[in-house]
């Protein structure tokens, strides 16, 4: 009897464990994964991927009066992290964030326009605007992306609308390409015999975002259309599995026209960049932006509203003026942004005048030029160089880009060693505007370099990669040295042990005699010191792979890149 008691005592708990639980608990392969216990170390939600810690008040509160025309000054450039994490993406020298000391000079570069511009023109009846000869076939933000799943370039653009226009507004069309330069307009079924994919709205700006991190295939394409109903502009959020057939979801609160949306994947939030015309007095109106963010694009759209309490930024104090209308104060007409490598790239359409009534009387096109800015927190923008990134052509009478240049969502695309930027431009045919799409190209990472003969020492860094890469153009030679936190050379990684680099390469591996890898230095704190003789460096990064993938974001994508939108091994 005693033996039976002990036998039952042993087997009963085992049977309860094996058989117990709710009847509806899945079994086999459907069992939910084991949840690891929470870490003893609390997660700091304000700590970003690069070591920047966001302020407690987020988003920051800014004044729409005292800061209206002062642009922005990122806090993290004057209050740097004690250690900068460079594990994500190529590290660009667009500001002084990475630099502790240097005697090299920062040089900015600008994309070159493709000689065959424009690459997309209005040729169809549904691309005409009105009946007097105006026509429109260009993104108004909209989007140009490379879809790695299909191996195809894709463009969404605004067309004049022709007979499909609502209250004179445009429609949304789709085009595709195999090389990013030559485009076709496929005949689709949404509107029989056309390439229209969205209409029946009084549209203004729109954004089509190819969300490469989206797990729900039916929402891989997201549209944030700005359209007017009953006199009010609102975001109209739509989703699609293919970018052609769209399902309407929700609308926002009232906003203004020329508002945009983009994803900041570094923080996994959707940013609502809302135009706000701030009335200063009876004679002065300043075009500025309001800010909203939300991790859920549907909830974010529903809450989005243009309010001065959400003021973000207006023009910088040193914006360039229109040479023919020098007394007009410049303003921010639009802002788009794209995640590229380790930063957010911002594109600012800076309005330089004149107002529409003056344009009509003087028979000119209002001047918007596209400027570029950089952000490491997704909110604070740095614009040291105030020259146009995409400039109007004032010397050729029939140039496609005479005026009103606008940036495009998704740009740039990474095509080999180059970046492809798409933009819209306008010209006059008599008194009618013709709006077309252009292309500009830049060296990969080629926004700015540290140039000359001299040295550059970084701030204290940490990383989890193994292979050191640079994007550089060096006529003499470049060597790299690694230092500990006390500025002492790390054994095996001295300047003398570094194999000198010479040449022009957007992805060159740096090695040391006896040390082809930095694996032994993972997660240790160190500084990098560059010695450059007659050359320039655009970027550096430490890759987990000998192939040089950066683990950064790839903006609008490109041939051969990972479908995730991250530069990692396929």
How should each PLM-predicted stretch be described?
Residues 6-7, 26:
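General helical structural elements
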Residues 31-570:
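Carbohydrate-active catalytic/glycan-binding domains of CAZyme proteins
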Residues 7-15:
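Bacterial N-terminal signal peptides
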Residues 1-4:
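Positively charged n-region of N-terminal signal peptides that target proteins for export
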Residues 15-39:
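Bacterial Sec-dependent N-terminal signal peptides
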């Amino acid at each position: 009897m005693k033996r039976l008691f002990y036998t039952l005592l042993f087997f009963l708990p085992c049977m309860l464990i094996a058989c117990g639980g709710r009847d509806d608990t899945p079994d086999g392969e459907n069992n939910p994964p084991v949840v690891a216990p929470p870490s003893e170390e609390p997660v700091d939600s304000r700590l970003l991927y690069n070591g920047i810690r966001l302020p407690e008040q987020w988003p920051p509160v800014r004044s729409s009066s005292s800061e209206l025309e002062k642009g922005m000054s990122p806090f993290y450039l004057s209050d740097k992290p004690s250690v900068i994490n460079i594990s994500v993406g190529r590290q660009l020298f667009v500001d002084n964030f990475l630099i502790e000391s240097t005697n090299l000079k920062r040089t900015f570069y600008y994309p070159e326009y493709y000689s065959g511009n424009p690459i997309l023109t209005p040729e169809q009846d549904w691309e005409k605007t009105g009946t007097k000869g105006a026509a429109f076939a260009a993104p108004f933000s909209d989007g140009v992306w490379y879809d790695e799943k299909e191996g195809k370039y894709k463009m969404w653009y605004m067309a004049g609308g022709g007979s499909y226009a609502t209250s004179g507004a445009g429609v949304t069309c789709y085009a595709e390409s195999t090389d990013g330069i030559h485009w076709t307009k496929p005949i689709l079924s949404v509107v029989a015999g056309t390439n229209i994919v969205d209409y029946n709205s009084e549209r203004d700006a729109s954004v089509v975002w190819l969300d490469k991190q989206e797990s729900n295939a039916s929402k891989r394409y997201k549209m944030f259309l700005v359209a007017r109903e009953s006199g009010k502009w609102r975001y109209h959020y739509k989703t699609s599995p293919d970018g052609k057939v769209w399902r309407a979801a929700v609308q926002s609160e009232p906003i203004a026209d020329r508002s945009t949306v983009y994803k900041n994947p570094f923080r996994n939030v959707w940013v609502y960049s809302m135009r706000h015309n701030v009335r200063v007095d009876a004679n002065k109106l300043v075009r500025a932006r309001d800010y909203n963010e939300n991790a859920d694009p549907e909830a974010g759209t529903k809450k989005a509203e243009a309010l001065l309490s959400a003021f973000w930024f207006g023009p910088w104090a040193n914006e360039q003026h229109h040479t023919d209308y020098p007394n007009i104060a410049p303003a921010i007409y639009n802002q788009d942004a794209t995640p590229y490598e380790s930063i957010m790239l911002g594109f600012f359409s800076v309005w330089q005048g004149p107002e529409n009534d003056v344009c009509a009387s003087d028979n000119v096109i209002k001047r918007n030029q596209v400027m570029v800015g950089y952000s490491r927190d997704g909110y604070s923008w740095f614009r040291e160089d105030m020259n146009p990134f995409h400039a109007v052509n004032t010397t050729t009478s029939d140039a496609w880009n005479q005026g009103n240049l606008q940036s495009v969502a998704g740009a740039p695309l990474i095509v080999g060693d180059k970046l492809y930027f798409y933009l819209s431009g306008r010209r006059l045919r008599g008194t009618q505007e013709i709006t077309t799409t252009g292309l500009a190209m830049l060296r990969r990472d080629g926004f700015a370099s540290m140039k000359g003969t001299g040295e550059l020492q970084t701030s204290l860094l940490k990383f989890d990669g193994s292979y050191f890469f640079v994007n550089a153009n060096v006529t003499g030679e470049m060597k790299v040295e690694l230092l500990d936190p006390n500025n002492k050379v790390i054994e095996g990684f001295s300047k003398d042990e570094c194999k000198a680099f010479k040449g022009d390469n957007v992805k060159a591996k740096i090695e040391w005699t006896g040390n082809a890898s930095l694996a032994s230095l993972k997660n240790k704190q160190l500084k990098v010191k560059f010695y450059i003789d007659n050359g320039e460096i655009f970027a550096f990064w430490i890759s987990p792979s000998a192939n040089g993938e950066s683990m950064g974001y790839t903006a609008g994508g490109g041939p051969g890149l990972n479908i995730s939108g991250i530069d990692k091994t396929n």
